[in-house]
């Protein structure tokens, strides 16, 4: 069944049909298409545009189509001759309920229909991704709560910098993924206006009640410009941008896990169930899942750039180029959902080697800043203290020892301000625990933050 053809004298070339059809991929939102159609005919009947009997017959037919598609009793084949999911649903409906099915499209264009379907689908997927992000945040919070006193080195430039805790490190990613949830929420708020009733681009002469249709579909209200309604893909660009940032956060985290999982670091061990082996090297246990998640970020970025490039030269209103949005959005959404699901499972099954982390934190002079602060607290200007401790570090490097092991007399040779209590000041636990400002790794600060995170997840 075609939704057009009266003014044509030739059949569509098969290659043209194959190139033009979208049923092979837009069948993904058949539920949203049916939901939108049910709302549309409900409004049409309320406005007296359709008879009550036509409404009943159409809704009965649409519900039977969804039931059969859900159960597998009805399948969608790209070879069926239908151009897209809209024509498939309308054609199948007409086969089932007869003449009434031909009235389904009254007061509607595929342009506003597909805009609605994509918004409904995007809204549903945002809800699902929000749940996946929440699951990940719950797992990160559990790791934080269990590791308030698991010391590890913090890094800058991949060089050891200062001692922190595993809880503090996980908290950084908690913040990132919390922002990701917030971005998805913002997108949903901005896009939650109903385009149905905009027609092809100029509305319709039928007395539609667009506000009623919007209410039936849980939108805040109707969109206010019919041309923008059918030509707008900003919400998809925003979504792809947000998904790209999620993918970037996952990629950064995976990069750290890959590094931590090496024999050189040994901070973590990825569970066997989330690892793979080598076809030639029997000893290998590879972090393939982390590497794949890291790699798939480029795929998501590509979708964003592709859609931006598609949209940049399009005049108003609808253009067929916009059909390209679906495969890009579908793939990016599925990719990020899969990555979130796998990443959460990988984190939940991962072993954190606390003893290795703590031993590493004791090396590399991570307490040097605290030695400088010790001097500052005794009246030495920070810039002078910085230079003094730099000399201490150089002395320790020459002797192959840590600051903790340098004799007091050698401290005092460089600065007489040092006293016996310097060793307590630069002890790793002291270095971490005295950092109590908001956002710092000390237990007092971390407990307050964790309480806020827990409250955030319970809302």
PLM feature segments, named:
Residues 42-50, 165-168, 237-245, 370-379:
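Short, well-ordered beta-strand elements within core beta-sheets of diverse protein domains
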Residues 50, 74, 265-266, 381, ...:
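Conserved hydrophobic residue
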Residues 217-309:
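Acidic, glycine-rich loop-and-beta core segments that form the ion-binding/anion-interacting portion
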Residues 1-203, 208-215, 221, 276-277, ...:
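A helix-coil-helix interface module used to build multimeric assemblies
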Residues 1-36, 99-100, 281-459:
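Glycine-rich cofactor/substrate-binding loops
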Residues 37, 65, 72, 129, ...:
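Amphipathic alpha-helices that form helix-helix packing interfaces
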Residues 146, 183-186, 190, 219-223, ...:
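Conserved helix-loop functional segments at active or binding sites
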Residues 132, 158, 162-172, 176, ...:
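Short, contiguous, pocket-lining structural segments
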